[in-house]
């Protein structure tokens, strides 16, 4: 019963959206930490 509930809950839209936003923010933060000026570098 709990396994069915937890699997169903973990695949719901708010949980998936929160995980997606957290992973995207982490990738951007780490990229900005290793390459500080590339996110705002002018393309010229």
From Swiss-Prot:
Keywords carried by this UniProt record: Membrane, Photosynthesis, Photosystem I, Thylakoid, Transmembrane, Transmembrane helix
A Pfam family per the record: PSI_PsaJ
GO biological process: photosynthesis
Compartments, record wording: Cellular thylakoid membrane
UniProt keyword Transmembrane helix present: yes
Membrane topology category: Single-pass membrane protein
GO-annotated cellular components: photosystem I; plasma membrane-derived thylakoid membrane
The keyword Thylakoid is assigned to this record: yes
Main location: membrane
Residue ranges crossing the lipid bilayer per the database entry: 9-29
InterPro entries, per the entry: PSI_PsaJ, PSI_PsaJ_sf
Protein function: May help in the organization of the PsaE and PsaF subunits.
Stored PANTHER family: PHOTOSYSTEM I REACTION CENTER SUBUNIT IX, PTHR36082
Family label: Belongs to the PsaJ family.
Protein name: Photosystem I reaction center subunit IX
Species: Prochlorococcus marinus (strain MIT 9312)
């Amino acid at each position: 019963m709990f396994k069915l509930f937890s699997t169903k809950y973990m695949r719901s839209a708010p949980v998936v959206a929160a995980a997606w936003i957290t992973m995207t923010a982490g990738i951007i933060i780490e990229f900005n930490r290793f390459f500080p000026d590339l996110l705002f570098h002018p393309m010229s």
